[in-house]
């Protein structure tokens, strides 16, 4: 309950795709372990719509190949999906998540599946065992990944749309998110699965990143996103600085 209270009913991770693996996906890990110990108590939680929405978030912000729609501190290269995402999809009954995870796993050129920007992925013994036990299933899973044409997450103001070769991502919401940038209204665009209008994400974390001087860093400022600056005035941080009258 303490974890889930920070999510809206739509399951959006307001920190972005890169942080999904440290948030929703680790929720699955905890519940999976607990349900193996006390099945009657914890297994029913996987039937909760909110948890399924949390699981499928990563599918809905996936563009193509290695790219994800990104905002805030999130990188567009959020890392490959694999066994944990596959099992999460299996547990909540999401064919879309299973298909994405299996396809991503099969596309990995590294036979040991160790090349991931998240270092914990290959040093965590449980993650490695999960991969070993799921590998045969993922290699044989034949369904192709699929995406919704439009997705709207009102809890965080995240929007995604697809038409032909184009993919659009938009960040509405407010400037009060976790790992926030002053990026309300910013957009990213992909064409044929490649970046067209980008969000540069964040530099390497330093002491300043999580200090009162955070918004002195240029990557945090609205002028360095796909946004207008009026008479030299940029956006300010805080939940009160938010999008209004959003139409999707």
Which residue ranges define each predicted feature?
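Generic structural "secondary-structure junction" signal
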Residues: 9, 15, 71-73, 230
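Short helix/strand-bridging catalytic loops that position acidic/His residues to coordinate divalent metals
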Residues: 8-14, 38-43, 176-177, 207, ...
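Active-site lining segments of carbohydrate-active enzymes
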Residues: 1-18, 134-144
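Contiguous N-terminal and early-domain "leader" segments and peripheral loops that mark the onset or edge
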Residues: 1-13, 117-119, 240-248
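Carbohydrate-active enzyme catalytic cores, enriched for enzymes
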Residues: 22-196
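Residue-level signal for pocket-adjacent positions within structured domains
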Residues: 8, 64-66, 223
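Active-site rim segments in enzyme catalytic domains, especially the processed small/beta chain
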Residues: 182-248
């Amino acid at each position: 309950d303490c974890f889930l209270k920070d999510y809206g009913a739509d399951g959006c991770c307001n920190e972005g795709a890169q942080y999904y693996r440290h948030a929703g996906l680790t929720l699955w890990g905890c519940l999976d372990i607990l349900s193996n110990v006390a099945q009657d108590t914890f297994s029913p939680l996987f039937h909760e719509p909110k948890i399924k929405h949390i699981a499928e978030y990563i599918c809905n912000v996936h563009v193509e190949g290695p790219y994800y729609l990104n905002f805030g501190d999130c990188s567009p290269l959020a890392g490959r999906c694999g066994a944990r995402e596959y099992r999460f999809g299996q547990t909540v009954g999401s064919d879309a998540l299973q298909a994405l995870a299996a396809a991503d796993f099969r596309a990995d050129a590294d036979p040991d599946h160790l090349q991931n920007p998240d270092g914990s992925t290959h040093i965590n013994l449980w993650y490695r065992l999960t991969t070993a036990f799921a590998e045969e299933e993922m290699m044989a899973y034949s369904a192709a990944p699929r995406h919704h044409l439009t997705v709207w997450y009102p809890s965080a103001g995240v929007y995604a749309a697809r038409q032909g070769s184009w993919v659009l991502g938009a960040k509405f919401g407010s400037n009060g998110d976790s790992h926030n940038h002053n990026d309300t209204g910013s957009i990213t665009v992909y064409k044929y699965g490649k970046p067209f209008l980008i969000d540069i994400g964040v530099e390497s974390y330093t002491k300043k990143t999580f200090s009162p001087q955070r918004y002195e860093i240029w990557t945090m400022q609205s002028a360095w996103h796909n946004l207008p600056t009026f008479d030299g005035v940029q956006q300010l941080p805080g939940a009160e600085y938010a999008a209004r009258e959003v139409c999707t």
